[in-house]
Amino acid sequence: MNCTEELESRIAKAEKRYGPFASTHEAMGVMLEEWTELVDAVRSNMLIDIREEALDLAAVCIRLADNLHDIEAMRARSVK
């Protein structure tokens, strides 16, 4: 499976399991968690894990961008 297909699969699974992000802050928290896991994999020089974590991070970023198609709804959920 190529990266694009893997991303599509990960995004679909996450949307089915979790639905849209509750807020931009939730998305940022998930991104930071994935970023930390990617950093750990890079520091360990574990190439398979690096690929997996890079795809996980990319999927979260794309999900956030997709969730912003309805900016007003996201804004309402993201107000302090």
For each of these PLM feature ranges, what is it?
Residues 1-80:
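Flexible "arm" and connector segments at domain edges
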